[in-house]
C-alpha cells in the first residue's frame, strides 16, 4: 500500500469509527438531513447523493430535503469499513477464487492433454494459449460478476431464469464428467508419487483420496482457501521445466503469435480437445460459488451492497485475469516441454501426465522429470477438491440444499455428501480396474456439449439489466464471451461429426 493510500485508508476508517461511535449514543436523533450529515461527519452532500442513487445508502425525500435514518447511516459506516479493508489489501491478499480456478484448470488430466498435443503436433497449437486467454477470461469474469451482483450461485440463477428442467440434465452431465476427471486425476497423482517414492499404487491412491476428503470436509474455509492458493505454486514447476529443456525461443514466439491450422480430422480434433480442456464447465460453478464464499468470509454480504459491489468487481477482475493468465502460461509451458523433448525424439503417444513424466526422465534428465512429476501431484491436490466442490455447489443449488465450504458438515450434509461420493466413485474407478483415462474421452464429449449451452445462459444473464442492474459486463467481455460461445458450440458440432464418421 502506498503512503497516500495508507493515509486515505486511515482517514476514512477513522471517520467511519466516529460515525459508529456517535450514532451509538441514544441521545442522537433518529433522522438526519444530508446537510446535517455533512456538518457532523464531513461527508459531502454530493457524495451522499451518489451513495443514495447507487443504493449504498438508504435515503428518503421529506419536505424538500433528502433524509437518512440513523440505522441506514450506521449500516453504511459498518459496510464501508469492510469494503475499505478489501480495497486496501495487498494484491496478493486479494487473489483467491480467480487464482484457484485458473490453477485448477491445469489439472493432471489437462496436463495429459497438453502434453499429448505438444508431443504429437509440436508447437503448432501453441497459439491457442494466447488466443483462448481473452475468451476464457470473459467466461470466468462473467460467472463471477453474476454471483457478486446477485449474491447467488450460478446454478441457482440459471435455474430461476430458465427453469430447473433445463438446468438439471446439464448438472447431471457435469457430475458425471467431473467424477470421471476426479478418477483420472487421483490415478495420475498416485502414479506420479510412484515415480518419486517406492510406494504401492492402491494404498497411495486411498491415502491421497481420504486426505483430500478430510481437508475439504473439515478444514474451515478461510484456512482451506489459503492451502489451495499455496498449492497453485506447484504450477511453477512447469514453467521451470520449460526453461530447463532449452527450447528454441524464437520458434516458440513465432508459434504463439501466428496461428497455424491444418484441415485434417486429427488436427481439428486436437484443437477441439484443447478448447474443451481450457474452457470447462466445472470452472464456471467453482468460481461462481467461491466468490460468494469469499464475500461471506469477509462479511461484505448485505442488503446495501452497491458500494461493496463496485470494489469487489474490480478486485475480482484482477484476481480472474491473474488466474487465467497463469493457467495459459502453464498450458504453453507444458506444450513447449512436450514438443522440445518428447516430440523431438519421436515420442508422440502420451496416454497420461504420469507417463509423460516417466518419458521425460531419460531424455531431459532427473531434474526436469522430477519437476514435472511434482507439478502433477501438487496441482492434483488443488484440482480434485475443486471438481468435487463444483459438483456439490451445482447439485445443492438445484435441490435447494444448504451449501458452502464455510458451513460445517452437520449444517450442509447433502453438499458434503456429494463431495465425498464424488471422491469415492473416482477412487473406485481406479480400484475396480476401470481405466479412467479412456473414460476421459467420453467425459470430454459431455463437457464439450454442456459448456456452450451453459455459456449461452451465462452471457444472456450477464447482459440482462433486470438481473444485473447497472453491473452488466463491459462490451469487450460480452464480445469475447459470445465469440467463445460460438467457437465452443462449433467445436461440439465438429466433435459429434468426427465421432459419427469414425475419424481418429
Language model: regions and residue ranges:
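Extracellular/periplasmic helix-exit of transmembrane alpha-helices
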Residues: 135-149, 289-297, 325-355
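Hydrophobic transmembrane alpha-helices that form the core helical bundles
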Residues: 145, 149, 167-198, 205-209, ...
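Juxtamembrane transmembrane-helix boundary signature
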Residues: 101, 128-161, 169-183
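Hydrophobic alpha-helical segments and their helix-loop junctions in multi-pass secondary transporters
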Residues: 233-260, 277-291, 457-466, 491-503
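Transmembrane alpha-helical segments of multi-pass small-molecule transport proteins
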Residues: 171-172, 196-218, 234-243, 411-425, ...
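Short helix-start
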Residues: 2, 6-10, 14, 29-36, ...
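Loop-to-transmembrane helix boundary motifs in multi-pass membrane proteins
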Residues: 164-167, 202-206, 322, 367, ...
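Flexible loop linkers connecting adjacent transmembrane helices
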Residues: 113-116, 141-166, 191-193, 298-301, ...
